[in-house]
């Protein structure tokens, strides 16, 4: 099992990747708690560099942004194989969802996101610290 902050009894590190300032602010407000330590990135390249430096316990990311897309999810998966990845997008369809899940995402949400469902998904994936729980939501 991958040692994470969760398995060590510490606050989980969640990397939130979002290029829209309002959405980033909303997500940070929703996940701000003693339970999570938040890190932020504004695009796929910045997120990738941050993950190279230190793998978070979970990545919550937009899909359609600079340096985003299914290839971005594949790149993240190669450097963080056990880290749960949740993808959100406002421009998805069934094929997009399939491509993203095949690329290595653990969960997929269409925007606008139902915050309660997103929080439950984050909680569930962090509870399974191996990151192997494939769960898809829409």
Question: Where are each of the predicted segments found?
Answer:
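Non-catalytic signal-transmission and effector/linker regions of two-component phosphorelay proteins
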Residues: 1-15, 116-138
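Two-component signal transduction core modules
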Residues: 59, 85, 108-109
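Acidic, metal-coordinating helix/loop segments flanking the phosphotransfer/catalytic sites
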Residues: 40-58
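Two-component/phosphorelay signaling modules centered on CheY-like receiver
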Residues: 20-39
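The short loop immediately C-terminal to the conserved phospho-acceptor aspartate in CheY-like receiver
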Residues: 59, 63-66, 91
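Short amphipathic alpha-helix used as the core "switch/output" element in two-component signaling
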Residues: 49, 70-81
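Alpha4 helix (beta4-alpha4-beta5 surface) of REC/receiver domains from two-component response regulators
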Residues: 71, 92-109, 120
């Amino acid at each position: 099992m991958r040692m994470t902050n969760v398995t060590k009894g510490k606050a989980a590190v969640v990397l939130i990747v979002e290029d829209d300032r309002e959405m980033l602010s909303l997500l940070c407000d929703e996940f701000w708690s003693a339970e999570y330590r938040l890190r932020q990135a504004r695009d796929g390249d910045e997120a990738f560099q941050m993950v190279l430096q230190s793998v978070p316990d979970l990545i919550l990311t937009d899909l359609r942004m600079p340096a985003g897309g299914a290839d971005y999810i594949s790149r993240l998966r190669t450097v963080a194989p056990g880290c749960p990845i949740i993808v959100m997008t406002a421009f998805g369809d069934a094929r997009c969802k399939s491509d993203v899940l095949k690329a290595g995402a653990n969960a997929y949400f269409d925007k606008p996101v139902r915050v309660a469902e997103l929080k439950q998904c984050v909680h569930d994936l962090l509870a399974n610290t191996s990151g192997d729980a494939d769960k898809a939501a829409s």
